[in-house]
Structure formats: structure tokens, C-alpha cells
Amino acid sequence: MMKKIQRFGGAMMAPVLLFAFTGIVVGLASVFTNTQVVGKIAEQGTLWYNFWYVVAEGGWTVFRQMPLLFAIGLPISLATKTNARACLETFALYMTFNYFVSAILKVFYGIDAAKQIADGVTGYSAIAGVPTIDTSLFGGILIAALVVYIHNKYFDKK
């Protein structure tokens, strides 16, 4: 059991390694767009500000799409065979799950998740552009674990 927990912990490192670099990028962009640090060159509308704003948005990608990155990153270490295929399977199932949840909210409960997100209602998020319930990292990890289990168990079955 301890080996499985250690293996899972090691698998969590793949997505976590992205945090350091993107955190530095976001931090630098925040400093360079602060008028108290850089001066008038960092005011909105200047070329300097626009450049660092674009850099910051690129840096925020990892933090905004964490559930997706964890869902795709876990099979890299946890799948025993053809881990790239397991990653693709996980991505497909995770996105399908989010589309299902979005459709269920709309059809059965009359909730437009996109409107809820726009209105700032908590509990909703857009994952890769799909408005859905905010399952945070837990949803991505749970789907990844399910897919890896099924993949490892049935990949070689005929």
C-alpha cells in the first residue's frame, strides 16, 4: 500500500513542476506592471504594460487550468503501459465529464453555468472553455485515477 501511495505522490510531481516557472513569470509580470515599482512606463495602455500583460496571461494558464493539467499529468506516471494513450483517454473522458455536467445542469436544473460564471457565482468554473461545476483539482485527479485504473486493468484484454 505504501508503494502505491508513493507512486501516486510521484505522479503528482509532473504537473506541480510547472508551478515554479509559471509562478516566476506571473511574479515578474506583476512587478513590471506595477507603477510604484517601474513608474509611468507601467501605466495601462503603454507598450510596456501591454507586453507584460500578455506575458502574465500566458503564465496564468497553468494556474487557471490546474484540474486539466492534473488529469492529463497523472497517467504519465501511473499508467503501466502506453502512458501517452492513457493521457489521451483521460483528456477525452475528463472533457466528456465536464460537457455532461454542463448539459445536466442546463437540461435538468435549468442552470446556465456560463451565466453563473459571468455573474461571479461561486461553485462554477470554465475548464478548457466548458462551463461546469467547479470540481477543482479533486475532479481532475478522480477522473485520472479512474481512467488509469481501467486502462491498467483492461488494456491487454482481448
Regions found by a protein language model. Give the residues of each.
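Early transmembrane hairpin of solute transport permeases
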Residues: 2-158
